[in-house]
Regions:
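Conserved lysine of the Walker
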Residues: 61
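Core recognition of P-loop NTPase motor domains used across DNA-transaction enzymes
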Residues: 1-47, 103, 117-118, 123-132, ...
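C-terminal regions of RecA-like/P-loop NTPase motor modules
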Residues: 143-159, 176-178, 186-198, 210-312
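Short hydrophobic/aromatic beta-strand immediately N-terminal to the Walker A/P-loop
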Residues: 51-52, 81
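The conserved Walker
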Residues: 57
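Cytosolic-facing regulatory segments adjacent to core modules
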Residues: 40, 71-158, 172, 280-282
Length: 312
């Protein structure tokens, strides 16, 4: 009964929160992504929420996540935990340096840097070194160990966000007769519970099923919740589900209105408990993992719900 509270206290806390937001004028009640159009849709990522960022392999999930880590931990000095069974700490540092210094990742990995890039790297590495980012790169980490480590570090370091890259690599030591669906269901439910217990937004990166070739090469193809891999529970327990889609990845270079889709990343917000489903287009540079909002003509989202923010 430790979490039982009088509704009066919760109401008073919420009213004070939205009064502060109203004075601020940006309409953001949670953690900013650093992407203006995304913040308009999400109003910031809320404490205790489970946010699923889904897409095909090598589509840009880690790049988007690390760009948010840079915004939260380096620009705003808020502690972040980044859990990656798929990348070593060194690879994460390489990618963060690329983002911070605006130097192509290939230049950093190869060491083939211009004089100006070396100067930028020195400044960027100093900023990264002093940032409150905590990396766990244990391969095959279990959900039990993850819960233990995250709970301890959140309490000790007041972490404001937790990123997990990616969900399908978190191990479950459940019933040996469980299917893969059962294992992922247990992991995602426990992550949602942990997010609520710690009152911190959790971002889980998730793989999706391979789309049919005809679907993927269709200029109006849109990712959908049923694309989530391994468990329908991901959709059920997530407070928000967003898909990353890159038409250019499937050799689609124009949409039906003639808009140029080269270097464009589309974010489809397919589930959003604090607002409508929506989509945005971002001008992206994956050499340095940068994402900027872009104005596009005739972009709409046939979601069955009207967009509260009109056409982007």
């Amino acid at each position: 009964m430790d979490n039982m509270s009088n509704i009066k206290n919760t109401t008073d806390l919420f009213l004070r929160k939205i009064q502060t937001v109203s004075i601020d004028g940006r309409g953001i009640t949670g953690l900013s992504s650093g992407i203006e159009e995304l913040d308009k849709i999400t109003h910031g990522f809320q404490e205790g929420d489970l946010i699923t960022v889904a897409g095909r392999p090598a589509i840009g999930k880690s790049s988007l996540a690390l760009s948010m880590v840079k915004r939260i931990a380096i620009d705003h000095r808020m502690p972040v935990i980044y859990i990656s069974p798929s990348m070593t700490g060194e690879k994460i540092v390489q990618r963060l340096l690329s983002i911070v210094c605006k130097i192509p990742l290939e230049h950093i990995v190869s060491g083939m840097l211009s004089v100006e890039e070396w100067e930028n790297l020195e400044r960027g590495s100093a900023a990264l070194r002093d940032s409150p980012i905590y990396i766990f790169d244990t391969p095959g980490i279990s959900i039990d160990k993850l819960e233990e480590q995250v709970h301890m570090f959140c309490k000790q370091n007041k972490a404001k966000a937790v990123f997990i890259d990616y969900l399908q690599l978190i191990q479950s030591k459940g019933n040996p007769n469980w299917t893969r669906n059962d294992e992922v269901t247990e992991v995602v439910c426990r992550l949602k519970s942990l997010a609520m217990t710690l009152n911190v937004p959790f971002f889980i990166l998730s793989q999706t099923n391979r789309p049919e070739h005809k679907e993927a090469t269709d200029s109006i193809y849109t990712p959908k919740l049923s694309d989530l891999r391994d468990s329908g529970t991901i959709e059920d327990v997530s407070d928000m589900v967003m898909f990353i889609h890159r038409p250019e990845y499937y050799q689609v270079y124009q949409d039906e209105y003639g808009n140029d889709l080269r270097d464009i990343t589309e974010l489809y917000i397919e589930k959003n408990l604090t607002g409508h489903r929506n989509r945005i287009r971002l001008k992206s540079n994956y050499d340095i993992a940068s994402f900027e909002s872009v104005q596009t003509q005739n972009l709409s989202f046939d979601s069955g719900q009207a967009s509260p923010f009109g056409i982007f």
